[in-house]
Amino acid sequence: MQIIVNGEPRITQATTILALLLELGIEPKVMAAALNMNVVKKEAWESTLLQEGDKVEFLHFVGGG
């Protein structure tokens, strides 16, 4: 299916947010995710299904002082 990931079109076989992260080789522990402009809690990533045309945004947390 085709979705938008961080503003870029992407073809994916992933059906959930967690599967998409793993497909992209991204470490889930340090990420936040939004699906169609709605923040998705980490606990729901495995059960949140992706659909054709969805817009997914991943944000990486960086600590500092």
Please report, for each region that a protein language model flagged, where it lies by residue:
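Ubiquitin-like/PB1-type beta-grasp interaction modules and other compact soluble beta-rich domains
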Residues: 1-64
